[in-house]
Amino acid sequence: MNFENLLIELGTEELPPKALRKLAESFLANFTEELTKADLAFKSAAWYAAPRRLAINVTELAIAQADKIVEKRGPAVSSAFDAEGKPTKAAEGWARGNGITVDQAERLVTDKGEWLVYNAKVEGVETKSLIAAMAQRALDKLPIPKPMRWGSSKTQFIRPVHTATMLLGSELIEGELLGIKSARNVRGHRFMGTGFELDHADNYLTLLKEKGKVIADYESRKALIKADAEKAAAKIGGTADIEDDLLEEVTSLVEWPVVLTASFEEKFLNVPSEALVYTMKGDQKYFPVFDEAGKLLPNFIFVANIESKDPAQIIAGNEKVVRPRLADAEFFFNTDKKHTLESRLPSLETVLFQQQLGTLKDKVTRISALAAFIAEQTGANAVDAARAGLLSKTDLMTNMVMEFTDTQGTMGMHYARLDGETEAVALAMEEQYKPKFSGDTVPTAAVSCAVALADKLDTLVGIFGIGQAPKGAADPFALRRAAIGVLRIIVENKLPLDLVTLIAKAQELHGTNLSNANASDEVLEFLMARFRAWYQDKGIDVDVILAVLARRPTRPADFDSRINAVSHFRSLEASSALAAANKRVSNILAKVEGELPTAINSALLAEAAEQALAAKLAELQPQLAPLFANADYQQALTLLSSLRESVDQFFEDVMVMADDEALKNNRLALLNNLREQFLHVADISLLQ
């Protein structure tokens, strides 16, 4: 079998930067799926992407499909020949359809009889005749929400396409992609590079870089930008703030990255750095620079898409562009400082949170009361919690947050400090929204936790209370994120809070707003479902989660302790046998009619094995009681694992359902007592 390397490139107008990686990865995944379906062997495959191109490279691709032997089964021998042994019309028709005579057919014997069969050799199709159609199907399946047309063509794609190149080794593959005929011409950088004729698939990256002035390898371009930005920051005694999301976007915006350093007036540093960083990152795609102490420097790093003879001119241009945005931030900050956050409370009455749940003023009133309630249970300062809850949304009415929306909470913190609020109140203003995304940190300050929980629970109970629970993928109020936030805050801070109590208080504060009588139960179920999903994402086995869920613990911190304990129990040698024994006990007890016996009469313990089990339980119970009381479930299950030998011997020697009613009930009481000890933690009978 011979092999060649394949190169496919699509030359386009500027592709959406935030979609570039996904488009390229999907193109590659779709195409390699096509190769697999076509039984075309290859060694490896890679994708390339730049603002004006998508490309894939397949190494050591078979130049043709392998020949195949295809078994074509005909009629059964019993119906293929008549009484005189002559072929029937059915046999002749089948043979004729396969281009053979009946005499040329072979016979296949199976357990269901004997059949005529023809093993036809099917020659593999040349790869070059398949590539264009496969590439087109791969493009057709790309995740493009809003495709567009261009010119007079009816072809649709995410952006207009100008060139298509398909090379198998040095051979140009004929065909079209998105209405563009395959050709060797590859476009270079819009200003710096030249177009060229690609002679061989292997030369794509090299020629594109040397002649086209385009670094098509996305990961190489990204690494180059990061390294150069870090060097540039170090030269001015700082560290560049290079978040991966912004780095990805910048990488998707440039074909030939040139990293430059610029500056802005130091007077702007009087504005909270978060606002300056927001506009530098969000609006301008710049990398801010911080000193060793984490203080923002009056510099920024940006990436040009051209190697200029006069870089100072490009630097000056970017400084000129960013200055008005920084001046806006300065103006908003100075204007906002003239009014306290408390003075903005009346304006919250003009903003609707939700038609049935009232205004933002109504919401902060509820948050304030609920935050104080939570603070009392966690030992936090309830006065600060109530104050922070009341002010929690006031910064939404400031000029700064209206213009730079992502600074909500953060600017509230700065304004609260300027107003003379306590540090706990100020910090809660910022941390109320945490965690904002998967992997984000949770608030740790006690008042911040109370306010963050109150905000999320108020939304959850309110939206469920008006019958607008999330359905399918739709979640307009981000309730799934709120639910995970509630659970993470409680678990990671080990807060002694009960979900039932919190939900009931939130429901009480909503008063007559809620129309759904089942809201509290639905919110609890929703939180439990999020709990399960969260633990599954962390790699916890489903049966461990179900074993704990069976006990319906409604204190998240306690729930987490049980999960950890059962996970540890699974690692013990005795766990499988005890889980099986618990399942057996559960099945026996489930068949008992009426109330289960609980009192164990030692005088009725007739067999040595039941005496030993009862004695072992009696020995363990004084040790277990304080462990259960202190939620030391891991140690409790470790102690219970010592029951394995006694339990195994019991089931080997003792007939539980004895004819003697007193003996039977006493043994049932013993098993019930055994099971109850495990149920203090989880239903381990559900462990697989």
Swiss-Prot record:
Record's subcellular location: Cytoplasm
Subunit structure comment from the entry: Tetramer of two alpha and two beta subunits.
Enzyme Commission number: 6.1.1.14
Enzyme class: ligase
Protein encoded by which gene: glyS
UniProt name for this protein: Glycine--tRNA ligase beta subunit
Origin: domain of life: Bacteria
One GO CC term, this protein: cytosol
